[in-house]
Amino acid sequence: MRTTCLFISLILIQGIKTLPILEIASNDQPQNVDSVCSGTLQKTEDVHLMGFTLSGQKVADSPLEASKRWAFRTGVPPKNVEYTEGEEAKTCYNISVTDPSGKSLLLDPPTNVRDYPKCKTIHHIQGQNPHAQGIALHLWGAFFLYDRIASTTMYRGKVFTEGNIAAMIVNKTVHKMIFSRQGQGYRHMNLTSTNKYWTSSNGTQTNDTGCFGTLHEYNSTKNQTCAPSKTPPPPPTARPEIKPTSTPTDATRLNTTNPNSDDEDLTTSGSGSGEQELYTTSDAVTKQGLSSTMPPTPSPQPGTPQQGGNNTNHSQDATTELDNTNTTAQPPTPSHNTTTISTNNTSKHNLSTLSAPPQNTTNPNTQSMATENEKTSAPPKATLPPTENPTTEKSTNNTKSPTTMEPNTTNGHFTSPSSTPNSTTQHLIYFRRKRSILWREGDMFPFLDGLINAPIDFDPVPNTKTIFDESSSSGASTEEDQHASSNISLTLSYLPHTSGNTAYSGENENDCDAELRIWSVQEDDLAAGLSWIPFFGPGIEGLYTAGLIKNQNNLVCRLRRLANQTAKSLELLLRVTTEERTFSLINRHAIDFLLTRWGGTCKVLGPDCCIGIEDLSRNISEQIDQIKKDEQKEGTGWGLGGKWWTSDWGVLTNLGILLLLSIAVLIALSCICRIFTKYIG
């Protein structure tokens, strides 16, 4: 009996080993990676959209670069989970990965996979992987979003165009964690993003504990090549873990996935969460852009499939049942390579019970300020009616805090409201409060916040004052905010170039002359007649001309004021229509969600369900810009600018030259006549 058990154990251990699939940057020999990241996707509320940017160029044509950014496994089938909420992607990717022979490593898509949702920016990623032996899977916890399907596999032939693309969503537990294997040093990375990014390395650890190493934060603002510091991070510290007391539901077991991944030295930008951990919040409040270290999550002993299916649900259970949980600290187990990642520290309600690591110590006043801001920003819990799925109820209680998505053309993530006051604080607080009311009323659509933060597809024009700007998160530094692209930017007040030489600018309501003189026909005739009187006529003509100039300036002033008022009105209208479009999409997604059990909205309404709310914000903004440019085109002074022959003095000069030529011709003719008469006489 013992021999049989030993033989079975050897077979199981031998089956865990895989082929070498990754190559370390500072080592010429491939490394055997046989550890498996055990993670599950409990339900659709546990994932959200995250855009990312590869370090280096957007097209990774190097085999080594491609192998560093994608994990490949042999014999791992694609896993699909239901995803019904829908998401509007911001940055998406067309992927083409082949082996050295040119054979595609991506699977053919199922027949029921459609392109969904829409995307703002598309990057094309190409490359080869000499170590791949099968299909290509993305990072553990990462999924490509199609129509109502979130798949771990990027399918072959799904090359999308602008406005119709698959998105990438990632598990909240690891959306800011980058995995590395046996850290052998750092590589120089050419940054393609202006926001902070995250990289990971095991530092001095000789054995990778779990699926990720120490997390560092770096700031990049000038697209320059940076090499992270090689200072070894402090040893990992034990962190408390809250164990849930509830059991998984049928829905969680249905949506459980356990994709495998092996990815080394992958760099991403814009990682963050609306439910940041305590040490991340402390570093975000300081806003100094300094390097912060995140200790690796301890690796508990492998448990039953039930335990593996519950690891992502720790935060929800810890949020709703704090009084029924037991907090125990478990040290890391470096000898084991399998990690069950817990999300107990991602809940804001647990911040008071956790302590920050020593290396992330900040000013106590700053920490207390951050804690107060988080307490005041979190709305009160709303009592929900009992539902059929208790897991959904727990997840909705965990997503009540109003969050915003950090703006980036290549990424998007949820962060806490900023605690640093600025010129737009009141507008930000007002909009977030309005969204907070929406969250308390809806309380079941945690992913609709991405639609609220949908970027307006135009850039702020120069010479504008942005009074409604929701741009950066609390984790971004001041220098970083200056370079980050805004998430919502509405220009509501126009400030044109002013010139001290103009009498009336038309910028304000009362800077134009109220008396606009309209000359009558008799006055015109009288002025024309009096102008012929010697000595007296030129004076009358001068007064008449001065009156015309004053009237002209007043008309120009009023036209400029009208243009400014029109531009402001259009901008206000653009803001209203943009918000109406956003909330219309939110309502449509909510209706689709409610009618899912009956086959969706199109099943109920038929062909009438097809709607297309076109986003014309760019066209309207272009018209506003054109109005402002036309309004700024003005000519002042006596026409001394430009080329001399086209100016007023140039015209007078040309007339003088013509007069001199005429006089010269007359003199020449007179001389010719005299000479001719002299010879005849």
From Swiss-Prot:
Tell me what effect the entry lists for M405L: In strain: Isolate Sanchez
- Region (Mucin-like region) residue ranges read 277-455
Q: Which Gene3D superfamilies match?
A: 1.10.287.210
- Pfam families on file: Ebola-like_HR1-HR2, Filo_glycop
What post-translational changes are documented for it? N-glycosylated. O-glycosylated in the mucin-like region.
Signal peptide (residue range): 1-18
Bias (Low complexity) occurs at 304-313, 335-347, 415-424
How does this chain assemble? Homotrimer; each monomer consists of a GP1 and a GP2 subunit linked by disulfide bonds. The resulting peplomers (GP1,2) protrude from the virus surface as spikes. GP1,2 interacts with human CD209 and CLEC4M (collectively referred to as DC-SIGN(R)). Asialoglycoprotein receptor (ASGP-R) may be a liver-specific receptor for GP1,2. Members of the Tyro3 receptor tyrosine kinase family may be cell entry factors interacting with GP1,2.
Family recorded in the similarity comment: Belongs to the filoviruses glycoprotein family.
**What is the role of this chain?**
GP1 is responsible for binding to the receptor(s) on target cells. Interacts with CD209/DC-SIGN and CLEC4M/DC-SIGNR which act as cofactors for virus entry into the host cell. Binding to CD209 and CLEC4M, which are respectively found on dendritic cells (DCs), and on endothelial cells of liver sinusoids and lymph node sinuses, facilitate infection of macrophages and endothelial cells. These interactions not only facilitate virus cell entry, but also allow capture of viral particles by DCs and subsequent transmission to susceptible cells without DCs infection (trans infection).
Task: Provide the domain comment.
Answer: The coiled coil regions play a role in oligomerization and fusion activity.
UniProt-recorded name of the protein: Envelope glycoprotein
Name the species this protein comes from.
Answer: Lake Victoria marburgvirus (strain Ozolin-75) (MARV)
State the organism's lineage.
Viruses, Riboviria, Orthornavirae, Negarnaviricota, Haploviricotina
